[in-house]
Amino acid sequence: MSAYSKVNLLELENSAQAKAAGVDARFARSHIDSEHLGVSRFRYPPNFQPTDGHSHREQEEVYVVLGGSGKVRLNDDVMDVKQWDVVRVAPSTIRGFAAGADGLELLAVASDRPEAGDGQPAKDWWT
């Protein structure tokens, strides 16, 4: 492994387009050979409302709102978010984001995780 790596998030595959219309999700972890961190970019269209959330067994995440506004739901708490807000989420907390009228763009930084991942879907959680 090299001592450094570089990748452009917008040049990576959109991993969400088949799952949610208009949502853009790009994950850099496997492209930068990081042992301890993952970086992802999420873009939600205006007024996007999720139905599902997710949690993790081990992985802590920090989300930075790069643009737009919306809401974040953390377990049963819902908070407004706007540009440059930073939200830290413990692994077991179920989380999800909804976009406001101006859409929502996030950068997520994630800690260590098991090799196979540790995401836990929460289906129909935000309905």
Predicted regions and their residues:
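A short, N-terminal "cap"/entry segment at the start of jelly-roll beta-barrel domains
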Residues: 1-37, 46, 52, 118-127
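A generic "binding-loop/recognition-motif" signal
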Residues: 58, 77, 93, 102-103
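Beta-strand residues in well-ordered beta-sheet regions across diverse protein folds
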Residues: 65-66, 73-75, 98, 107
